[in-house]
């Protein structure tokens, strides 16, 4: 997995993710769970967010590799997720978004 461009990732987040997710420390849940503190967190574990059983039971920890695979096709990676996002097919886009998320969700 190649390093991504944070600026391009920020633009992808703004256009593809921000309507449902926040990255700020006190951003809170929207349609989707808050993403602050994402790295090292288990699927289905954000307090106050109503996950599907599929998300709660997946049991993986979010990191560069799991996000890279998930962001390509969320419904394939976690069948039963309620995330409506179709995914990012281009590896470069996924790398850019992951670079932004890694930087902005600390």
Curated annotation (Swiss-Prot):
SUPFAM superfamilies: Cytochrome c
Modification after translation (UniProt): Binds 1 heme c group covalently per subunit.
Coiled coil location: none
Alphabetical UniProt keywords: Electron transport, Heme, Iron, Metal-binding, Methylation, Mitochondrion, Respiratory chain, Transport
PROSITE patterns the record matches: CYTC (PS51007)
Protein's UniProt name: Cytochrome c
Gene: CYC1
PANTHER family on file: CYTOCHROME C
Residue list for modification N6,N6,N6-trimethyllysine: 75
A single MF term (Gene Ontology): heme binding
Family that this chain belongs to: Belongs to the cytochrome c family.
